[in-house]
């Protein structure tokens, strides 16, 4: 018997036994340890399947994962004509699927549910001996594996929720698009950028729901839910010094490596000017109450006066908040010299900058030149991404997010935020499409910040709460025939 058939039969039996309609569950009743319901079991299986497919940006195969998820969608009942798997390279295919709405274009443009299925490379020897990055493990209330947090949880949830919606017979009013994509982490943009340039009609949307935001809990207490509505822009610069070189037995003052080192030291000490946007201002204002007293006071002070020296000292000392206040530039790669007994003729360093949305790459380049103050050091723009304007916080999207957050976690604030890292939302924002980073996946930054790193993990409870949150949000934004709370 297929999963869908068995689940439908079970639902029918349950309906016969329960003459009343159940109202929305709060988060405490969504997940019971060791007692997964059928929808959660399916989500776990899809999650496991995705994590155990190596989709590393250089050593893995993203197409394998896209094909596997396309197979799942066929099993859920999505017609072949509404499933697209494709990309510019054999190992870099994307999956785009469409759930047809009852009103089609009359209901407006589609809702796009976006997740990337490529991951940062991971080596077994870099992880704890008990874990393999491409083996799905559960231990002490956490799921472990590369991509568990970034971003295969959302991908698995989107696929699993299709089964639930199909079983219920739910039909959206507007079309719902699911896109699982390649090359978000790095690479020559075989994912969202390629889709928008080559198959724009497949991913055109009214709104985009993507990664970038999530809830925060600390010591078991749920604090707030965040919505990523802006992000800094990634640009790489090359610092380059050339020299005629010579024999190392006759050193000179004009050494290319030494000259570059001096420039790097200046860049390392420099702090870019402080900026506050409407989004970061609201973030600090609303987050202040949830932080330790000293940080909270600094957040309130910086909102009142962005030049407050005491507040700047406190916030700049915290790497998380320092990056939200200003453009940041850091050296990430270094090379120089060609022989152990020769003076270097070339020395280069890569400077990775995360640029505040109100600044340009050219402005940052000019700042670096001014700070280095050495015409012998070239500052070259190596690679840059398109500007990413902030998403307007529309009531028709934010109101359901607030409502569902309150249903599940009570009276906690929903706080807009700016991501210091990059997401694929930037491609849609550049085209004027509102993109919201929201997941309902809660974590404790003090212990769970492991994406891209050793022993990446996702709290088990958070995964199933996120599954429920995104299920309700999808129905609300796509036009549910019944109230979101009527499940």
Where are these regions (language model features)?
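Bacterial N-terminal signal peptides that target proteins for export
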Residues: 1-14
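Acidic/histidine-rich catalytic neighborhood of metal-dependent amide-processing enzymes
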Residues: 142-143, 147-226
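Loop/turn elements at helix/coil->beta-strand transitions in domains of secreted/extracellular proteins
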Residues: 76-81, 107-111, 172-176, 203-206, ...
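Acidic/His- and Gly-rich active-site-bordering loop/insert found
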Residues: 26-148, 165-174, 351
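N-terminal signal peptide c-region/cleavage motif recognized by signal peptidases
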Residues: 19-24
